Amino acid sequence: MKAAILATAAALTGSALADVAHMRRGHDSFHHRRAMHAQEPEETCGCTTEVITFYGSPTLVPISTPSATPTPAPAPETTSTEEVTTTLHSTSTSTVTVTATPETPEVTLPTPGVTSFSSTGVYTIPATTLTVTDTTTVCGATSTELPSGTATYGGVTTVVETSTTVVCPYATVKPSGSTVTSVIETTTYVCPSAGTYTVVPPTTTYVPTSTVMVYPTPATFTPGTYTQDAQTVTVTRTDYTYVCPTFHPELPSSSAPAPTTSAVPTTTAVPTSTVVPSSTTSVPASSSSSSAEVPQTTGSGQMGMTYSPYTNAGGCKSKADVLQDIATIKQKGFTHVRVYSTDCSSLEWIGEGAKQQGLIMILGVYIDSSGVSGAQSQVTDIANWAEWDLVSLIVVGNEAIQNGYCTASELASFITSAKQAFKAAGYSGQVTTTEPINVWESSGSALCSSIDILGANIHPFFNSEVTASQAGKFVQSQVDILEKICPGKDVINLETGWPSKGSANGLAIPGTSQQSEAIKSLRNDVGALSVFFSFSNDLWKSPGAFDVEQYWGCIDQF
């Protein structure tokens, strides 16, 4: 099992966007695998024109003969009579206007809003809150950026372990007069044996230039109050289409409190189509279309903590120990827990603890040296588990490109396939991967279309010119760079921290007091968008670069 979790340390290259001194170095061994029914839609009302045609019997209309001009009297036997018959149709037209009053007021559901920007600039979309009283499935919307040429989008793929009949709802468009209407249909697909099947084929299209394609997807909403966070959108090209992230339900009062300086602004209005230009440069809020709350992406706080259920010897912790650890994470004020893979009963035990404590999970699909094919079973495990109310984000791969386990194109394809499997199992939240900044700079063009939010691991210690007190500012500078790589997509820092023991890396000095100083800086500057690494020291790892790999445990700093 150890062989599956060890990785070769790789040095990060410089960046055209960031100073070489601000690049993360030699940090790959962190990431080893041990390591809304709504009220029924009202009927369409309008004006109806009724045309009634009456048909009568033919009527004979005699034609008067003009007075005769005096002429010599004709012989009697030559007298003749002429009769002319004309048939008329009588038509009567009546117009009846019917005005219907809906029995119930219109219900607005928290489906994603689609906004088009005709010019470049920075725009702010205000926050909105809606209440849903009944469960319903409607057409939502999602988007993907297509490269120029022939491309595919949409579709549903499922993974089965035995002969199975799959009944799958899917969204499509149908002609309606001179326009098209999004509708939900259901297909039944027979999977004859274990394997991966395309239940709903993707759509193939041709675009002359890079285009953001918006298309319908099924969305089910259960009763509750849904909030859509304010969005700051940086538009870098004209005629840009932006799909607002789906609303997320508010957590019950028993859940852990959100960071005090990043409360979600709300209104009682229906989502507005007005977009207000803004000069703000703050990081846009991240959101999720799943039923779990997603963290704010600006300001101070302590959003998440990474957790690996391993003992110091590298074995699996007991269920009791796992539940106690998850309780501690909640007691320390965190709202999210990040899990790297599905081994050691992570889904079941950590999931149970998260449910008990009101925590939200960031799930992981770990890719090791076996490549993307070796990670397929984890996708199946997560799809079968399907406790989506606990999940806000699924991270497919953890520095897999950095470690040389797959190429960017292989990872992008695997993410797309995994997203389809999760969606077929009922998941409507976000999916991403995570890599250091240099990989995003070199491979962002291949990855951006497959992810919903940009995930990065940002560790200031591996920059030799960053002191512990500068950790937060350094991470924010890296986030600023990452925001430009996948325009319109938020950034989440999925790993950050500081070691408590080891050798110095220039100005970056490990130690207990330095860790405390760094954690304080990170909490103040980027805590609300960051997952702290890690819950406890990982003594089962090898020492690694600067002998620090075992000493990142930081739960006691909170």
UniProtKB/Swiss-Prot annotation:
Residues 64-105, 251-305 are annotated as: Disordered. GO terms for molecular function: glucan endo-1,3-beta-D-glucosidase activity. Residues 293-305 have a biased composition (Polar residues). Keywords: Carbohydrate metabolism, Cell wall, Cellulose degradation, Glycosidase, Hydrolase, Polysaccharide degradation, Secreted, Signal. It catalyses: Hydrolysis of terminal, non-reducing beta-D-glucosyl residues with release of beta-D-glucose. It is found in: Secreted, Cell wall. Its EC number is 3.2.1.21. Residues 1-18 form the signal peptide. Pathway: Glycan metabolism; cellulose degradation. It is an enzyme of class 3 (hydrolase). Its main location: secreted. GO terms for biological process: cell wall organization; cellulose catabolic process. The active site is at residues 399, 495. Residues 76-105, 252-292 have a biased composition (Low complexity). GO terms for cellular component: cell surface; extracellular region; fungal-type cell wall. Beta-glucosidases are one of a number of cellulolytic enzymes involved in the degradation of cellulosic biomass. Catalyzes the last step releasing glucose from the inhibitory cellobiose. Belongs to the glycosyl hydrolase 17 family. This is Probable beta-glucosidase btgE. It comes from Aspergillus terreus (strain NIH 2624 / FGSC A1156).
